[in-house]
Amino acid sequence: MSVPGDVRGRGLSEPPNLNREEEEEEESHEVLLSVLAQHGQLGLCFYDSRDFTLHYMPDTSDNHQLQLLARVVQEVSPHVIITSAKQERCMVQFMQGLGANPDYRPEVVTYPNVDFGLEVSKQRLLSAHLPFLPPAVSERERISYLSSCISFDSPLMLRSVGALLKCLDRRRVGVELEDSSVGVPILQFHTYTLKDVVYVDRDTYSVLQIFKSELHPSVYKLQSGEKEGLSLYAILNHCRCKFGSKLLRQWFLRPTRDLVVLNRRQEVVRFFSCPRNSDSLNTLQASLRNIRNIPTLLRTMSLSHTKVSDWQGLYKTVYSAVCIRDTVRSLPQSIQLFQEISEGFSDDLYYIASLISRVVDFEGSLAENRFTVKPNVDPAIDEKKRRMMGLSDFLTDVARRELEHLDARIPSCCVIYIPLIGFLLSVPRLPSMVEKEDFEMEGLDFMFLSEERLHYRSQRTKELDDLLGDLHCDTKDMETAVMTQLQTTVLERSACLYKVLDLSAELDCLMSLSHASQEYGYTSPTLANHRRITLRQARHPLLELCSPVFVSNSFLSSETRERVKIITGPNSSGKSIYLKQVGLIVFMALIGSDVPAKEAEIGLVDGIFTRMQSRESVSVGLSTFMIDLNQMAHALNHSSGHSLVLIDEFGKGTNTVDGLSLLAASISNWLKRVPAEVPHILLTTNFHSLLQLGLLPSSGLLSLLTLETAVDGDELVFLYQLKEGICRSSYAANVATLAGLPPSLVQRGVEVSELYRTGKTIKRIDRPSTEEQANKCVCVVEKFLCVNLEDQSVDLQRYMKEELLPSGGDLL
């Protein structure tokens, strides 16, 4: 074999070996997921040893089936799952389900609940091995930096981080062969969002008033909870059942960019928003009022703790579900949700409804406060009840015959039936019957004394017990057996009931959005996967409800031009409202709702980032400006070309020059990116020098806007109309006058501002500044200049005391 052939052969054989090494390296990486679930909230994080990155997901709500956690596990595929040994039942069931899956069985590690302590977890995070930080960094600086990387306002997530760090240190993931002093490195922190779920943080939810909790006005409910104030959720939530409201809240907490899901929602909203379909809307909403919490009902049945009210609730639920199905079947089946309801609400519902109707005697059950069955269900039960109904006359006849054999002193008697005891002879207590020995009668067995009546068991009552038995208890036992059989039948067909819950909740949410669209005059937006956003005559969904007149404004952001909009204008001119308006409209589109605009075309975004409000936290002692910087850093580091960024007055919390510099640098950072990576940015500022000094690079991506105002004499009039241009004046004095500041104070402010702008001396007004004082100042300065400070023979103390102080003392 020739040498070239050998060389060529090795050249062909080496790449497969390299590929195998790469595959082995790929397979050797490990993903560890730490999760904690409490009271419907979920916090989790995971570490990927391939790139030494810690991914975290802020606390979010999840249902009792932990569907959100299931999606995370499906996407991440962790090798190890870390959780607390003290967990809720839903988490235990979830882990058992993972263990039963033969195709995927991650290792489950449980730590004591103390290892998930909040303070312990914070200390572990502060002590983590972060190679990108200088060794000499102080604890305070480390806290400031970490607060910009990870949210300290999510306690469940922070606790899961603490447990994850402990597991990493124990297993020494990625540093198994290193010295024990070498810690597991964390090279970066990343916020984790599920595929097609839009990132929206807590600050954004708060500043846009998507949710707003208020104390309940009722004095009886001050301690029990809160009520929803004026918020987007409050005005869109017209759901008729609780689980519909709960699902709508989940949609708000997880806005999606999945076009298939959004189109599915939009077609239902469009259908019910049409006035000619209002009858169907009202009929369905009336039926939805009767849908109860099906999982709770079925769980009660499985434990055999079913009450009469539970049977009533189940019957109303199933009957209403049948009515919903019949109504929906008359609607267009081209709409996917209608088709699923028509098929998913199977005939099992009608079977369950008719079975409950035939078996359960609701009137009798309410009267006896227990489960009773209707006639003709069980002949044996009917016979028992027939005997009990005729028992009164029969016992009267027996008592008459018993009286003939009693002591002549006994004036009357009766035969009574007591459940569990049986038939007894009851006679009145005579005055001579004082002691227990006086109660004894021949042929009778004394049982007890109650309410001045003596109760005995006679031969005839014993015969009645043998003949009739314990009618009441026997009937109750037989009816309980029927109830158990009915429960079993219902539970066997429970799959259709869970479909009722899911589809009814979705239908309720979409009809709620349709109701809001009709009431407030919304428009169905056109959604697409491009990077454009176009809004014509858009309105603020909350402010228009509080103001008699609202001025609409448009918004346009194309893929390659005018993506960065800088808005200037006086205070109170509507800059912040415009930012919130755009943010809310985009958010509404991401949950499938119609929007307050004449026309809307919205390219789906992957995140909404805001720097508008400093939400201070006691968990991390940061200044207001530091919180602002963290929000800005988060937007700079995590926004993409498909994001929406809203920035309001960034930089005002520090020195003017420093704030202006940071603002200019941040905008320049975005403008220097390639157009495909520049997000939609709306920025308001009162730093007019940002534009006047030319601190920003010229770019077609930049658009300068202002809000129109008019000056009528000394009065400033806000027109709230957006137009292209720059605001040349802040009109601070006019705004101060509108705010009610004293005219003298405003006038003084104008004078000082003009003197400062022109570089002239600002004279004090608390005492007169005379020419004589100015001359004295010149004299003192000249005497200072005459002194040779380098001359060692000069006695400065004597010079100050004898020369300077006498001439300049009254200036002090």
Regions found by a protein language model. Give the residues of each.
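Conserved phosphate/pyrophosphate-binding and hydrolysis machinery centered on Walker-type P-loop NTPases
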Residues: 154, 225-226, 255-259, 281-291, ...
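Flexible, glycine/threonine-enriched loop-and-boundary segments that flank and lead into catalytic domains
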Residues: 394-412, 523, 540, 548-550
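Secondary-structure edge/capping motif, primarily at the C-terminal ends of alpha-helices
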Residues: 272-279, 298-305, 328-332, 402-406, ...
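Charged, surface-exposed helical/loop "interaction arms" that form contiguous linear patches used
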Residues: 474-528
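ATPase nucleotide-binding head domains, primarily ABC-like/P-loop NTPase cores
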Residues: 154, 238, 433-464, 510-812
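Charged catalytic and DNA/RNA-contacting regions of genome-maintenance
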Residues: 1-271, 286-302, 306-397, 698
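Amphipathic heptad-repeat alpha-helical coiled-coil/stalk segments that mediate oligomerization
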Residues: 319-390, 417-455, 509-570
